Curated annotation (Swiss-Prot):
It is a peripheral membrane protein. This is V-type proton ATPase subunit H. It comes from Sus scrofa (Pig). The lineage of its organism: Eukaryota, Metazoa, Chordata, Craniata, Vertebrata. One of its GO terms (cellular component) is vacuolar proton-transporting V-type ATPase, V1 domain. Belongs to the V-ATPase H subunit family. It is found in: Cytoplasmic vesicle, Clathrin-coated vesicle membrane.
């Protein structure tokens, strides 16, 4: 992996400002363990250990104690956490656990060893805390779970992993709702604090996705749609960076690159790149683009990503970026790599590749291929390939798009397909395309109405030569009557 990979590990483990500030406050409020002992809420063994542990100031002293008494440490932390209900004390214990792990990643093993003896999993003690009311407690528990899962010798699996990933998705979705202006219950938490807590959740995801097995589990849990939902809404640049970082991590796996084709990732990232004013966001987008082209083992997959980048006019953006100076040499290297690869793809680009890429991007425009008689004569039948993949996208756009230009071009293309492919009418009817085109004959946009009308006529008429003459004479009147 690259240098940036190491930086990312640090990014993901560092707490957000609000959590760092609260943790400092929590550390300063020492707990009176003696009162808990007198109230018989904790054992003398746990009381004695925690007081000795607190007295170890230097990392060396602490490390020495953990090496000889690691099992007791895990046992005491977990006993205190499960037997004390006072929120302030629970916060204090969680902060101690988090500090202990952050100082040395290998210390996760003391929790794994203790859990094994109790026939539990290391994270089973922390997962229930995700349901608590206090946001600091919840997010500290979430960070500890991520560290145990990412740095431990055992993988989180099954219902535990599903539960944790669902919690992450719910938190990220709440950010998505906030971005879209929908009211979200956050109690007395300000939107600034709330967004920092969501950044902490994103940090947990970044840490998890560094492990290949968790990448597959996240994708299976529909996690990519969750990430795309956050990116498609207005979110701060830090969260934007973290979500794209997560995509970059996913794209280290060739199988993931294959799977990610089905999501409209390139258009979304190219839009963000266009507007980006933060170098770290630009850097991570370029690194993700590079992974898509470099890590994909299938030539067809690489070509599809390259075409999508060309279609979204990334070449022009790269040429502009190349003129700028960067502190980070990774950026310059990635720009050079992408320009070279996309330059090669442009040389090989056929009109059908261009059409296919435009259609898959969902951003249809009146590019020359749509009006080219030669293109349709040679390629109409190719829309049937891969079980009508492109036709299904075309009909889907007619169903879901609210962009008049996309609808007009899609209706036009349906008409051209049935005109040039003898059995096209039946295929379009089976895909529900005929009804979708007819629905747009009364659209408020004149271009949509006109192209839908033409497509319906092509679906109905058998004599194309006669229809062509009719359309030539009707076009001006139709346009005037509809406008």
């Amino acid at each position: 992996m690259t240098k940036m990979d190491i930086r990312g590990a640090v990014d993901a483990a560092v707490p957000t400002n609000i959590i760092a500030a609260k943790a400092a406050e929590v550390r300063a409020n020492k707990v009176n363990w003696q009162s808990y002992l007198q109230g018989q809420m904790i054992s003398s063994e746990d009381c004695e250990f925690i007081q000795r542990f607190e007295m170890k100031r230097s990392p060396e002293e602490k490390q020495e104690m953990l090496q000889t008494e690691g099992s007791q440490c895990a046992k005491t932390f977990i006993n205190l956490m499960t037997h004390i209900s006072k929120e302030q004390t629970v916060q204090y214990i969680l902060t101690m656990v988090d500090d202990t792990l952050q100082e040395n990643h290998q210390r996760v093993s003391i929790f794994f060893d203790y859990a094994k003896r109790s026939k539990n999993t290391a994270w089973s003690y922390f997962l229930p805390m995700l349901n608590r009311q206090d946001l600091f407690t919840v997010h500290m528990a979430a960070r500890i779970i991520a560290k145990l899962a990412a740095w431990g010798k055992e993988l989180m699996e099954g219902s535990d992993l599903n539960y944790y990933f669902n919690w992450i998705k719910t938190q990220l979705a709440s950010q998505k709702l906030r971005g879209s202006g929908v009211a979200v219950e956050t109690g007395t938490v300000s939107s600034s604090d709330s967004s920092q807590y969501v950044q902490c959740v994103a940090g947990c995801l970044q840490l998890m996705l560094r492990v290949n097995e968790y990448r597959f589990a996240w994708v299976e849990a529909d996690g990519v749609n969750c990430i795309m939902g956050v990116l498609s809404n207005k979110c701060g640049f830090q969260l934007q960076y973290q979500m794209i970082f997560s995509i970059w991590l996913l794209a280290f796996s060739p199988q993931m690159c294959e799977h990610l084709r089905r999501y409209n990732i390139i258009p979304v990232l190219s839009d963000i790149l266009q507007e980006s004013v933060k170098e770290k966001v630009t850097r991570i987008i370029l690194a993700a683009f590079r992974n898509f082209l470099e890590k994909s083992t299938e030539r067809e997959t690489r070509q599809e990503y390259a075409l999508a980048l060309i279609q979204c006019k990334v070449l022009k953006q790269l040429e502009n970026l190349e003129q700028q100076k960067y502190d980070d040499e990774d950026i310059s290297e990635d720009i050079k790599f992408l320009l070279e690869k996309l330059g090669e793809s442009v040389q090989d680009l056929s009109s059908f590749d261009e059409y296919s890429s435009e259609l898959k991007s969902g951003r249809l425009e009146w590019s020359p291929v749509h009006k080219s008689e030669k293109f349709w004569r040679e390629n109409a039948v190719r829309l049937n390939e891969k079980n009508y993949e492109l036709l299904k996208i075309l009909t889907k756009l007619l169903e879901v798009s609210d962009d008049p230009q996309v609808l007009a071009v899609a209706a036009h293309d349906v008409g051209e397909y049935v005109r040039h492919y003898p059995r096209g009418k039946r295929v379009i009817e089976q895909l529900g395309g005929k009804q979708l085109v007819m629905n747009h004959m009364h659209h408020e946009d004149q271009q949509v109405r006109y192209n839908a009308l033409l497509a319906v006529q092509k679906l109905m008429v058998h004599n194309w030569e006669y229809l062509g003459k009719q359309l030539q004479s009707e076009q001006p009147q139709t346009a005037a009557a509809r406008s």
